[in-house]
Amino acid sequence: MKAKGLVLLLVFIALLSAKAIGSAKLHKSFAGLTYSTVSMRSSQKITILDGIYKRYSNSEKVVGHRLAKSELSMLSQLVGRIDLSKINDLEVPSKRYRFDGAMLAVIEVQIGQKVYVSVPFDHDNPPSQLKPLADHLSSMHL
């Protein structure tokens, strides 16, 4: 009976430890995030650094504020789904940005001191691996 209780206690402690480690990893997954789009006539840039969201239009700051922990958690999850070591080698579905048929877009993710820069892609047609993050960042008109 004591052995069964001890096993249950150890399983419970292991689960709590795993959750705490996962939670710490989630909140430290990225230090900075940038989503930039540019065409011949305009540019947009979204930066998230130390939990502060800033959006620029044609190099002028439009809005800036601190993100809620839930929003940072969502962004961390989306970033966590991307293989950052291959972010600059992804296959893009279209390249209309080359003749200004679409806005050129790039995503940059900073983890620690390392910055991962995506392959350039059409703003409205990102690579499938970047689509959830790109769509979420594009919809953040806060």
How should each PLM-predicted stretch be described?
Residues 50-53, 68-71, 120-126:
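A short, sequence-level motif marking secondary-structure junctions
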Residues 62-91:
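Mature extracytoplasmic domains of secretory-pathway proteins
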